[in-house]
UniProtKB/Swiss-Prot annotation:
Belongs to the UPF0246 family. This is UPF0246 protein SpyM51747. GO terms for biological process: response to hydroperoxide. One of its GO terms (cellular component) is cytosol.
């Protein structure tokens, strides 16, 4: 069985379905630090204006006082990649695929199933805090490595900020899809292409119920197709021709 890892997103939208918010034990130490930060501290940590930091501060305070609602993570996050993932009108098989084989890597919650209930928050591995004298990446590394050991065949749709959260020896069987546009024989990639394609790729995997590495090679989605000459055992390259 394939396991997919996807990142969080800064952009969020409030879904209709909500749940009580239950915070994992490992997240409690981070919450304690975040709620102790002033608006000015948060603005510096997030590199945002103080007005925006006030909103984030209120979210942390609501979490600490157990006033927050929680929403299925894959519905709450609404960045470019998430908007290209099929999230509505799923078949029973697609819903099972999404909730059992897709996991979200979070700097606040750890690694969670795609439908895990989470509260609105802003937090990533660029957030400048120390937990028990450790960086966020060092703090989460044991948890992340344990997940990798339990799920050796991972399809990683993660961005570069996650590269060194996992130890190298835990990623030996990982495959990282790469998405490129071809125009007049020239190949290019950029953030927008990659984010849209990650969502479309995951949707195609769900719709086709991909369960083997070889099945990924036959996928055609949003104009992309597998390119064997540019691919390696650990990096699958998908090309889209541009006019």
């Amino acid at each position: 069985m394939l396991t997919f890892l996807i990142p969080t997103a800064k952009e969020m939208t409030t879904p209709k379905e909500s749940h009580p918010h239950l915070l994992p034990q490992d997240s409690q130490a981070i919450l304690k630090i975040m709620t102790a930060m002033t608006t000015e501290d948060l603005a510096k940590s997030y590199r945002i204006k103080e007005e925006a930091a006030k909103k984030e501060q209120q979210r942390w305070q609501d979490m600490a006082s157990q006033q927050s609602l929680a929403y299925p993570a894959y519905q709450l996050f609404n960045g470019l990649m998430y908007r290209h993932i099929k999230r509505d009108k799923l078949t029973t098989q697609e819903q099972a695929y999404l909730t059992q084989q897709v996991y979200i890597t979070s700097s606040f919650y750890g690694i969670i199933p795609a439908n895990h209930p989470i509260a609105e928050h802003r937090h990533d591995f660029h957030t400048r805090i120390k937990i028990e004298g450790q960086s966020l990446k060092s703090y989460w590394r044991p948890c992340y490595n344990q997940f990798a050991k339990e799920h050796p065949q991972v399809i990683s749709l993660l961005s570069s900020e996650f590269d060194d959260v996992f130890s190298k020896d835990c990623k030996q069987l990982w495959i990282s899809p790469k998405f490129m546009a071809e125009k007049e024989g020239q190949f290019k990639t950029h953030s927008t292409i990659s984010k849209k394609a990650r969502g479309a790729f995951l949707t195609a995997c769900m719709e086709n119920n991909c369960q083997t590495v070889d099945s990924l090679k036959s996928l055609v989605f949003a104009g992309f197709y597998y390119h064997p000459d540019l691919s390696t055992d650990y990096e699958f390259v998908y090309i889209k021709k541009e006019a």
